[in-house]
């Protein structure tokens, strides 16, 4: 079992859902073209975009309202170029092997049978050291958003990993995972 996700007991068959595929394709294309305006159209203003990154040993995250390729988070790590010639595949997400520095499969994947829990894991870890870092409402909001989200991975030299979330009957990009 992948520790970065948990089984989604209410599996929604989005394989035939053109809206999800369109959002994923649109985000990958906008990111490839480094088009801030197009990326920002895929982010809901109420949800913002959460960026996961690793400033040291442990992952952390920050939430932003708008995305800007010229203002990366963290500032010392520019957003790398991403390239995709792959069609979207709805299947188990690829795994990255740190020892070989390779993915176990290549392509663009979205797994609709599990939900991402990276943010909850980061919060749980950070609360061990800073018990008052997050308000109860923030934790509840993160957990609720994860229940309505899917993780997408584009493998490659510069992988692109992001989450999409259903909100008010529409899908939006809500997390960019740079860790």
Listing of model-derived features with the role each one plays in the protein:
Residues 18-34:
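Short, aromatic-enriched amphipathic alpha-helices that serve as compact interaction elements
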Residues 27, 37, 162:
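Residue-level detector of short, conserved catalytic/binding motifs and their immediate flanks
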Residues 35-46:
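Short, well-ordered alpha-helical segments enriched in acidic and aromatic residues
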């Amino acid at each position: 079992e992948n520790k970065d996700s948990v089984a989604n007991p209410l599996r929604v068959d989005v394989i035939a859902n053109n809206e999800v595929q369109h959002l994923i394709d649109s985000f990958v294309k906008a990111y490839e073209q480094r088009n801030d305006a197009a990326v920002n159209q895929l982010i809901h203003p109420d949800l913002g975009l959460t960026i996961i990154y690793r400033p040291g040993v442990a992952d952390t995250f920050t939430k932003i309202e708008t995305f800007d390729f010229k203002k990366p988070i963290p500032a010392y790590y520019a957003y790398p170029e991403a390239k995709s010639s792959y069609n979207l595949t709805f299947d188990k997400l690829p795994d990255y092997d740190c020892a070989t520095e390779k993915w176990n499969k290549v392509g663009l994947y979205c797994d609709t049978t599990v939900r991402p829990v990276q943010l909850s894991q980061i919060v749980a870890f950070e609360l061990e050291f800073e018990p008052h870092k997050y308000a109860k409402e923030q934790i509840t909001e993160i957990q609720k958003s994860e229940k309505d989200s899917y993780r997408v991975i584009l493998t490659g030299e510069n992988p692109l990993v992001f989450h999409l979330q259903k909100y008010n009957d529409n899908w939006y990009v809500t997390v960019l995972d740079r860790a």
